[in-house]
C-alpha cells in the first residue's frame, strides 16, 4: 500500500503553510510494474511563506520583506541489504546474538544491531530559509533616498542538508547565498542643436538630431556564496577532506543612446563581471578554520572598505548598434534602411596557482571584436 496526503493553511494575505506527507511499504508497486522496490519509504515536507511587510505601518507600502522556510525529510528502509538477498532484520538479529555470545551486555549488543540496521538505511533532512527580493521602501520622498536606498534589492538564503546512507555514515552540507542589486533608470538630459536647420539642404535631414548626455539605465550587483561539506565514509577510518566554497561575483552594466535621429545614432551597451575567491580567508596560517567573526574582520575595513578576495576571472562586453541615416535626397530614405553592429569582448582568467610556472602557463587574456553591416 501507499498513502499520500497534503494540507494547506492560508493566513489571509500574511502567508501560508503547506504540508505534504507520503508513505509506501516495500511491496507497493504501480499497475505497470510486477514487483515493488522492497524499500519502505517515508517523505515529509512543510513549506512556510510570509510577507513581513504586512506588519509595518501603511507608510511603508513600497517595502517588500518576503520570507520562506522549508523543511523536508526522506527516510528509506530497505528489506534487504544493498546488492544482496540478506534480510536486514535477520542480519541485525545475528549481530545481536553474536555480541551476546561474546559476553557483551544487552545494551552493547543492541548498539551493534542498530548499527547494522542504520548502515542499510538512507536518511536525508533538509532545511532552507530565504528572504529574496527584499526592498526597504523608506517612506521619504527625496531623491537622495528615492534614487538610492529605495532602488536597492537584496536577497539572502541559507540551506543545510544532513544525510546518512549505505555509503556515508554522515554527510553535512551547508551553504548561504547573498546578493544585492542596484538599478537606476536615468531621466533624459539632452539637447537638439539642429532644430533651426529645417530649411537647410542636407543638414535639414538631421533637424531632430538629439544628443544624450546620460545613459538611459545603469545597474550593478554583488553576489556572494559560501558553503562547506563534511562527510565520514563507511569505508574509511578518517573523515573525508572538507570541501569549502567561498566566492564573490560583482557586475555592472549600462545602456546609452549617445545620439538619436543623427547620421549614425549609436547605442552603446556595456557590461562587465568579475569573479573572485575568498577561500584563502577560511584558514589561518596554522591550517585552522577561522570563525565567522575572524573572517568578517578580514573582509571589512581591513585596509579597504571590503575585501572580495583574489580575482580569478574577468569579462567585458561592448556592443554598439547604429542605424545610419543618410541625407534625404530625392526621397531615397524611404527605400534605404541600414543597420550595423560592433561588438568587442575581453576575457581574462587567472588560475591562482602558487607555482609561477603553472600560473603563467594557464593565465591568459583574449580580445575579440567584430563589425557587421547590413
Model regions: which residues?
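Exposed, low-structure sequence patches enriched in small/polar residues
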Residues: 1-374
